[in-house]
Design a protein with these regions (language model features):
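GST-like domain detector, emphasizing the conserved glutathione-binding G-site
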Residues: 1-126
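Short Asp/Glu-rich motifs
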Residues: 37-39, 196, 216
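GST-like fold's C-terminal all-alpha helical module
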Residues: 101-199
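Terminal-tail/helix-coil boundary detector
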Residues: 203, 207-216
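Alpha-helix N-cap and coil->helix boundary residues
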Residues: 65, 89, 185-189, 205
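Conserved beta-strand edge residues that scaffold enzyme active sites
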Residues: 32-35, 191, 211
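Basic/polar N-terminal segments that are highly enriched at the extreme N-terminus
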Residues: 1, 144, 214-216
Length: 216
């Protein structure tokens, strides 16, 4: 397996965590999203993903884009350990939780959106406030949902004592939130999960600072 990745891409970060949880061997092919006008726009990568986005997982003569689709593929390729809770209600909740991040929070502070704002003459302060607004709005809903499932302090991860797709999606989004000085004290349950996950090898090894393309 080859993962086209950028060290700071939240979506690529999700997939790296999932690959590590499943203990699947893979190699990284870095795609720098800023260098040389963005390597994702170069013709050779455009052939791999016409959307010009990372991540892309190449395996069995397939180029699979979209982090959630990649994780679904990994689940089919190697069912255990699963990225989903055994409990049906928690499985549905983890999918809902992941989609809230991947569809409603992350796209609004993706690099190409922020670049569009900057090209529209938005200041750095404007861009930061934009990111903070949408992350805070999303995290407020996530905190409400997850805290209701942890009324008895059940489980160290989002849904129980095993990492799931929800944790794969949450940790990169919190990492991104901290880059923009979002106050995580407002989200104690999310932050508790984040702190626990940071200490786990599968998450630690997937972190931006551990990637070969992380700048010295």
């Amino acid at each position: 397996m080859i993962l086209y990745s950028y060290f700071r891409s939240s979506a690529a970060y999700r997939v790296r965590i999932a690959l590590n949880i499943k203990d699947i061997n893979y190699s990284i092919k870095p795609i720098h999203l800023l260098r040389s006008g963005g390597e994702q726009h170069h013709p050779e990568f455009h052939k791999i993903n016409p959307q010009n986005l990372v991540p892309v997982l190449t395996h069995n003569n397939q180029n699979i884009s979209q982090s959630l689709a990649i994780m679904e593929y990994l689940e089919t390729y190697q069912p255990t350990p699963s990225l989903f809770p055994e409990n049906t209600n928690n499985k549905t909740a983890s999918q809902e939780f992941s989609l809230m991040i991947c569809c409603d929070i992350h796209p609004l502070n993706n690099l190409r959106v922020l670049n569009y704002l900057k090209h529209g003459k938005a200041s750095e302060i404007d861009v930061t406030q934009w990111v903070q607004h949408w992350i805070n709005e999303g995290f407020s809903a996530l905190e409400t949902k997850i805290s209701s499932t942890k009324s008895n302090d059940e489980g160290r991860y989002c849904f129980g004592d095993t990492a799931t797709i929800a944790d794969c999606c949450l940790i990169p989004q919190i990492y991104n939130a901290l880059r923009y000085d979002v106050d995580m004290s407002k989200y104690p349950t999310l932050n508790k999960v984040y702190q626990h996950c940071l200490a786990q090898p599968d998450f630690h090894q997937a972190a931006p600072e551990q990637q070969t393309d992380y700048p010295d």
